[in-house]
């Protein structure tokens, strides 16, 4: 089991916004995550999170679970009747214990994609994998650092996971927060737009969705298609 103890510090939170700090952190710490709250008026649901510097992760894709641990150990396990996605997630979670102030905030950050329904229900999903952007169906990451904004109290908390005998790096993070400079990139598209469906095929999908709604099969039906193009810049500047 991997054991961590938290190191924490609270700062005034009215001098920064989640987006402004994320723009500072994204270049220093790749794979940072931002979860921003839009409710600043009450004590509930008033927290925003920035998580950075991954230490462990679990991903599920192509019928396989990949578990990556803080010591560099990596385990790939095929999913089936005797070992499901839920078993992989439970196994991964049981490998960690976090104690200390703010430990209740130190969960996993990630996503479960729509296509992951096939790992939990007997619903067939057509496989579609793009060689340039084959994101996992399920991906959750344990991060070393969290910045927690309490918009109701105007507080900013730094939470760090420290292994046994490891000194904290709170001061280094605080210095980065106080830095007034961050990179800015102009966003622009390059070349022609690409899609996996033609315009007419997509229109027919929409017409089919309208027919299902009118017939009463569903109350809401959303139709999507993949659109891609080369870009210069960063996604946060879009």
Question: What are these language model-derived features?
Answer:
Residues 1-238:
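Extended alpha-helical targeting/anchoring segments
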């Amino acid at each position: 089991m991997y054991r961590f103890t938290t190191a924490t510090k609270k700062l005034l939170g009215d001098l920064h916004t989640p987006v402004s700090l994320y723009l500072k952190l994204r270049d220093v710490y790749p794979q940072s995550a931002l979860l921003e709250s839009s409710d600043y008026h009450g004590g509930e649901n008033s927290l925003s999170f920035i998580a950075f510097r991954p230490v462990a992760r679990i991903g599920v894709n192509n019928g396989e679970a990949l578990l990556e641990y803080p010591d560099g150990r990596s385990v790939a396990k095929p999913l089936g009747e005797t070992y499901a996605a839920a078993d992989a997630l439970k196994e991964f979670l049981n490998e960690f214990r976090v104690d200390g102030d703010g430990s209740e905030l130190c969960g996993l950050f990630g996503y479960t994609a729509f296509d992951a329904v096939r790992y939990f229900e007997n619903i067939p999903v057509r496989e579609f994998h793009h060689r340039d952007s084959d994101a996992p169906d399920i991906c959750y990451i344990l991060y070393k650092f969290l910045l927690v904004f309490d918009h109701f109290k105007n507080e900013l908390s730094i939470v760090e996971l420290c292994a046994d005998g490891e000194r904290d790096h709170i001061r280094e993070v605080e210095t980065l927060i106080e830095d007034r400079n961050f990179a800015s990139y102009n966003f622009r598209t390059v070349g022609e737009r690409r899609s996996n469906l033609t315009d007419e095929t997509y229109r027919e999908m929409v017409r089919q969705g309208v027919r299902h709604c009118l017939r009463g099969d569903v109350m809401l039906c959303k139709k999507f298609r993949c659109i891609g193009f080369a870009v210069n810049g960063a996604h946060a500047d879009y």
